[in-house]
Amino acid sequence: MEKFTKLTGVAAPMPIVNVDTDMIIPKDYLKTIKRTGLGTGLFAEMRYNDDGSENPDFVLNKPAYRKAQILVAGDNFGCGSSREHAPWALLDFGIRCVISTSFADIFYNNCFKNGVLPITVSPEDLEKLMDDASRGSNATLSVDLEAKEIRGPDGGVVKFDLDDFKRHCMLNGLDDIGLTMEKAGAIASFEKKNAEQRPWA
């Protein structure tokens, strides 16, 4: 998993509440277990018209936001079913950070396991960041995970809190496998000792 230390990029505003995982990645795209290629299905029902053409009014189809790396979203983002394809789709599109006032628990935890940083802020701070993200080509935010702060285009700073363990995992690029590999030496030592003490096992 790629480390997340500091990210400076275009932030796209999506002031929609209760965006569920089916909206993030519709069920038609769940037939694969590959993590790549899902970016085309991200927000597909909002991104595309019935004939498959792009909806020009959808934020990620607008020229200023096509390469957005940060999403500023409405409350209760990621609710609904527990599909891990949702953070996969965000990451494959290029979005590495989602900022909201709240997230569904399963989606929130899945993000950390897949290299997407979900940040929770107050309604007042979200309103400011949403305004920053609405500046089109000037909608650039800097997310500093080490300092736990978001810096806007005008230099304003929004502080955020994050569990120390989750922060450690993101800073060091550790998913579940990475965490296990951190203990590889201890595991090998235990197995050797166990084999010596219990040769019959």
From Swiss-Prot:
It is an enzyme of class 4 (lyase). InterPro entries: 3-IsopropMal_deHydase_ssu, Aconitase/3IPM_dehydase_swvl, AconitaseA/IPMdHydase_ssu_swvl, IPMI_Swivel, LeuD. One of its GO terms (cellular component) is 3-isopropylmalate dehydratase complex. Keywords: Amino-acid biosynthesis, Branched-chain amino acid biosynthesis, Leucine biosynthesis, Lyase. GO terms for biological process: L-leucine biosynthetic process. The keyword Oxidoreductase does not apply. Pfam families: Aconitase_C. Pathway: Amino-acid biosynthesis; L-leucine biosynthesis; L-leucine from 3-methyl-2-oxobutanoate: step 2/4. It catalyses: (2R,3S)-3-isopropylmalate = (2S)-2-isopropylmalate. Its EC number is 4.2.1.33. One of its GO terms (molecular function) is 3-isopropylmalate dehydratase activity. HAMAP family: LeuD_type1. NCBIfam families: leuD, PRK01641.1. Heterodimer of LeuC and LeuD. Catalyzes the isomerization between 2-isopropylmalate and 3-isopropylmalate, via the formation of 2-isopropylmaleate. Belongs to the LeuD family. LeuD type 1 subfamily. This is 3-isopropylmalate dehydratase small subunit.
